[in-house]
Amino acid sequence: MVQRLKQHGFTACIAGAIMFLSSLPYLIAAVSTPSGHVYTWMLHNIDDSAVYLSWMKQVAQGQFFQENRFCIEPQKSVLFNIWFLTLGVLSKVIGGPLAYHVGRLVGVGGLVFAIARLAQSIFKDTKHQRLALLFTCLVSGFGYLFGGFSAARGFTGQPIDLFQPEISVFQVSVYSPLFAPALALIVVAVTSWINAESSHATKHAIVAGIATALLGNIHSYDVLHVMLSVLCIRVTNDVIQRRFHSRAWLLAIGAGVIALPTTAWVFYATRVDPLFAARADTDTRTAALHWVLIGFGIALPLAIVAVTNAIKARDLPKLYLAAWFIGALLSSQLPFAFQRKMLMGAQIPLAMLAMAGLLHVATKLKGDFPKILIGTAVLLALPTNVLWVQDAMSKLPANAGSTQMRPYLTTSENDALAWLGRNGKANDAVLVGPDPTSHLRFPGVALMPHLSVYIPAIAGVTVFDGHWSETINYGAKITSTVRFFDASTTDDVRREILVQNRIRYVLYPNKLADGPLADGTGAALLKSDGSPQYIPVRWSNGTLTSQTASPAYPVNPLGMKRVFSSRDVEIFEVVN
């Protein structure tokens, strides 16, 4: 009992340390907030973080089934997410950003305890369990040897640890409130199945099934990873023991039956909601195998040492880890557009095996050399995690995160979003004007409507041109956005864009907070005073511009009236 309490205490300390370290980038970003700005409490992949906040916002508004408010197309909402329902209810009490990070930290804690439970199932020695837990929480790949992420090399031409946080426990801990709990469920499911293989106890198979069912609701892609891994473990047991375990196969089938309903429901959603099906089919192919393996870093060669020893010793728990890793790799090669998403969790069994291999090598050394060896291995495993965080932090002075979206909004931009939240309805479509200075923050990305992702996340209404993956036909919609705001476009064409897309509000960057126009392409979007070319200026004091034509003509030819005005943003309502 005392030993168990000590072990739980150690795990809690590791969980607390990971929680703190994973929160540090956000805290630094918060205290670095520029004057006149508001921090969004997002940093990595703000695009997807905004999607999660949108789901939470919908729950706070009383919505049970999820809607994709980054799309204006009709949709049949049949999906719900238990985790984000919980966070959405919490957000109604404490606000979206705080609930977002509470969810992230709870997920991190659950993940660390799940990894500790796995270590206890693999290693008998308490010290070895602790080392395995530490190494698994810290390990990353060899991406740092390639100089960091390169947009030019894309997502298939460089080590995966540079752009896939799913394959690093630490990066998952920093990333979002979705990945950590999903990864924790993967670990719980497979660990429970490993325990079921060892004991043939029904209770472990039931836990594996329940964890997989929850995973199917929260992050359904990963169910394929779990099921293939369980299948590989099951086959490994029969091959090593040279017998067909009918009871174990029945337990596996039973666990699958328990897990099936939630995944079947998601599949049903793809049949009845073409919009969801198109979004789920976003092309995220797995990188070439050598980039995948390099992305696992030093853990891979050390794991090979462990597997070699496990085969000789017929050490089934460690061979189960190898089977798990093979199942994860196989799932990432299935003929689906979302291949690489299924690599999440593959680093867990590999890191456990790596520590086993490291301990084996260490036993052959004397004196301080075992400690030096283990310390060196940990140091070699850390740099990509550090580089990943440093890369995002280095972009903060330019008001950019890991993508081109802005971590900081000006106070008037935040006020505009608050106005939309108070006055707009959930299905009101908002057309967001392009930012002609976006390329200054994120080279190579010009004329991005940087406020668009925040419309569903903060205001809780629908956006026309919002998200590269969630918005159907995103490229065509960005083209329509630029065309609408181009000074050479006729009012007839603009009116057609408004009517065809049922636009209710147009959000226009009145005075861009990041400086005057510097882009030759974007210069045509504005008059010299920064106001829209196509809306007559009634008066201007250099900071605030009123664009409601004249007292005798309160609505401009496009059927829009100004309903909100601030230093940086104008909002126009389409009234006819």
Annotate each language-model stretch with its function.
Residues 171, 190-192, 204-220, 231, ...:
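Membrane-interface alpha helices of multi-pass inner-membrane proteins
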Residues 367, 372, 376, 380-576:
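Extracytoplasmic
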Residues 20-187, 220-224, 395, 402-407, ...:
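Active-site lumenal/periplasmic loops and adjacent helix-entry segments of GT-C-fold
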Residues 108, 224-226, 338-366, 372-377:
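Hydrophobic/aromatic-rich transmembrane helices and adjacent perimembrane loops
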Residues 204-212, 250-257, 311-334, 353, ...:
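Transmembrane alpha-helix segments characteristic
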Residues 48, 211, 215-316, 336-338:
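Transmembrane catalytic cores of multi-pass membrane glycosyltransferases
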